[in-house]
Design a protein with these regions (language model features):
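Membrane-interface transmembrane helices that cradle and orient dolichyl/undecaprenyl
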Residues: 113-114, 153-172, 180, 348-351
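Membrane-embedded architecture of ER/inner-membrane glycosylation machinery
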Residues: 2-8, 171, 296-575
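Transmembrane-lumen/periplasm boundary regions of multi-pass, lipid-linked membrane glycan transferases
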Residues: 47, 176, 188-330, 339, ...
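Transmembrane-helix signature of polytopic, membrane-embedded enzymes
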Residues: 15-21, 107-129
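Transmembrane-helix motifs of polytopic, lipid-linked glycan transferases
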Residues: 94-114, 152
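Extracytosolic helix-loop segments that constitute the early lumenal/periplasmic catalytic or substrate-binding loops
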Residues: 25-30, 43-66, 73, 80
Length: 575
């Protein structure tokens, strides 16, 4: 069992409660102040909404069509909070925020048990100031919840084998692995921890306790039993109904979205070194800088600290696992961040103050420069908005409204290293991160929200058509379902555009009173886009309305039979 390190923590104890309180505020700040934003948030919110409206939770649906891309746990959580609160605008962000809070507690408690209070606090602060962590904890993507399950799995295994035995936590780790798999297929990653544990964890610890016993095999059995709670009803229902749609759902969720997606990814293709050369240097700053500057300290501790070896080896295995797949995204490596933060905190707290000076000077200087950059950006937004990037034109009004907040944030970031120079580096970085997220949650989100939803387009649609008119969509987006005031018809999200267009053409021919909502960038063969009626812009696309006058005489595209009609049970749920 590793001995706790006394370390030489710089921060005064009186600051710790304030930083904890500010972290709690930052995690939940802004909830209820914005709607789900593309690309992924509207999808998960709409799926959860349909679960509550239909009462059918086993097979997630999107606009009435089965959604086979992700297992259901994350959508279940949003749906549960929607039922509890009655407010989807609140419910869709709660799972990630609570997962972030849970991850912070697990890291703190594990660090305290392995190396003491100082390391535990530093590990929490590292997570707080590493951009990727709060970025995911404050969004409605799957990855923050996945990160919690994986961290819980690692926590249980490490607590049992390094500071145990703790058979209850060992069992909890395998349940967490199962829930992680039911959230996203890579939830099995904590099991990789068994490799370094087998190498460096002896069968008996110094106290004579035996961590490796025959009953350890019950862990994987418990994982399979937990998985069966979802897989068995799903599989049996598919076999009983045996419809093509459910068969396709089962095969997609179990095979195409797991092994096939890993081995033969069809999007986000990147070179093998992508995480080392692109993702880590951007999403894990300044953690990566601290690691590079403390390589020598890691090497010095490697032989004497089994906990450090085990955690860093697991992080390396996770990076290797994702690097071997051709499909790569920055967010995939988020689950490795908590254990990496713990390892860095261990090294940092055993680093003499003199050896920390280079990192402290460098990162404090970067913080000042970031503040100066934000001040300059605010000045440009006020005085010369035409010099901003072209995409800023989409948010011209918002940019002007945000300028005061950007200025204040810039002054705060630049002032922290100067006014609080006696405080510890990690405290300064964490405070800067938390102030940034408070500004984002209370200022940026409400200001940008009208520009990130299709509410204006749908309001114009209601003004142009009669109440009973049937509306169809090509290349439909979930956010339109969230804001719709009437039933919407779509022609399968999964179908290629040519098939959707052909289905829409036949649907409109059957009743000339029907209309079609489409983005105007589509190259359509069955419709005359010169007969369009402009509705407005949403998500950097111009949306138009086509009626029967836009139908061409013939449509030779592939005939599709999929047609889904979504009827909102409760309207204006995001008001």
């Amino acid at each position: 069992m590793p001995r706790p390190h006394t370390g030489n923590l710089e921060q005064a104890p009186s600051w710790w409660p304030w930083l904890v309180g500010l972290t709690l505020i930052a995690l939940f700040a802004g909830i209820g102040l914005r709607a789900p934003w593309p690309a992924d948030e509207p999808r998960f919110a709409q799926v959860a909404r349909e679960m509550v409206e239909s009462g059918q939770w086993l097979f997630p649906t999107r606009g009435g069509e089965y959604y086979p891309d992700k297992p259901p746990v994350f959508m279940w959580l949003i749906a549960l909070f929607y039922q509890l609160t009655g407010q989807l605008k609140i419910a869709f962000l709660l799972p990630s925020a609570l997962a972030g809070l849970g991850t912070l507690w697990l890291v703190y408690d594990l660090g305290r048990r392995l190396w003491g209070e100082h390391v535990a606090r530093s590990a929490v602060l590292i997570l707080v100031f590493t951009p990727q962590f709060l970025l995911q904890a404050k969004g409605a993507q799957i990855d923050a919840v996945l990160c919690f399950w994986i961290t819980l799995g690692c926590y249980g295994l490490v607590r049992h084998f390094l500071v145990g035995p703790a058979w209850g936590w060992y069992a909890a780790s395998w349940v967490a692995i199962a829930l992680g798999i039911m959230t996203k297929g890579v939830g099995f990653l904590p099991a990789l921890m068994l490799i370094p544990l087998a190498i460096w964890r002896r069968r008996f610890d110094e106290s004579g306790h035996q961590a490796w016993r025959l009953r350890a095999w019950w862990g994987p059995v418990l994982m399979l039993a937990t998985l069966a709670l979802w897989l068995a009803p799903m599989w049996l229902t598919v076999e009983r109904v045996h419809s093509p749609e459910l068969l396709a759902y089962r095969d997609n969720i179990l095979f195409r979205q797991t092994a096939e997606r890993y081995a033969s990814a069809w999007h986000h293709i990147q070179p093998w070194h992508y995480y080392l050369t692109t993702a880590l240097p951007t999403m894990w700053l300044p953690l990566v800088v601290l690691f590079v500057l403390r390589i020598r300290g890691i090497m010095d501790l490697w032989s004497s600290d089994a906990g450090l070896r085990i955690l860093l080896s697991w992080v390396a295995l996770v990076l290797l696992f994702f690097s071997l797949s051709p499909g790569k995204r920055e967010v995939y490596i988020l689950p490795a961040l908590p254990m990496c933060a713990l390892a860095l905190a261990c090294v940092w707290e055993q680093t003499p103050a003199a050896s920390r000076r280079a990192a402290s000077v460098l990162l404090r200087t970067v913080l000042v420069l970031m503040g100066v950059l934000l001040i300059a950006l605010a000045g440009v937004a006020w005085l010369a908005p035409h010099r901003l990037p072209a995409r800023a034109d989409d948010y011209a009004e918002a940019v002007a409204a945000l300028a005061p907040g950007v200025l204040l944030l810039g002054l705060a970031l630049a002032g922290i290293p100067l006014l609080l120079r006696k405080r510890a580096l990690f405290e300064q970085l964490a405070l800067a991160s938390l102030l940034t997220w408070l500004c984002i949650a209370f200022w940026l989100w409400p200001t940008l929200d009208p520009h990130r939803t299709p509410r204006a387009v749908l309001q114009e649609l209601e003004r142009q058509i009669a109440p009973g008119t049937q509306v169809g969509m090509l290349e439909f987006k979930e956010q339109f379902l969230l804001f719709a005031e009437r039933p919407l018809v779509h022609f399968s999200y999964l179908a290629p555009l040519a098939q959707q267009e052909s289905s829409a053409w036949h649907w409109m021919r059957a009743d000339p009173a029907r209309v079609l909502l489409v983005p105007d960038h589509l190259a359509l063969r069955c419709f005359d886009l010169t007969r369009q009626s402009v509705l407005g812009q949403a998500h950097r696309r111009d949306w138009v309305l086509l009626d029967a006058t836009a139908l061409r005489e013939r449509c030779d595209g592939p005939i599709g039979h999929a047609l889904y009609r979504y009827v909102p049970v409760r309207k204006d749920i995001l008001s």
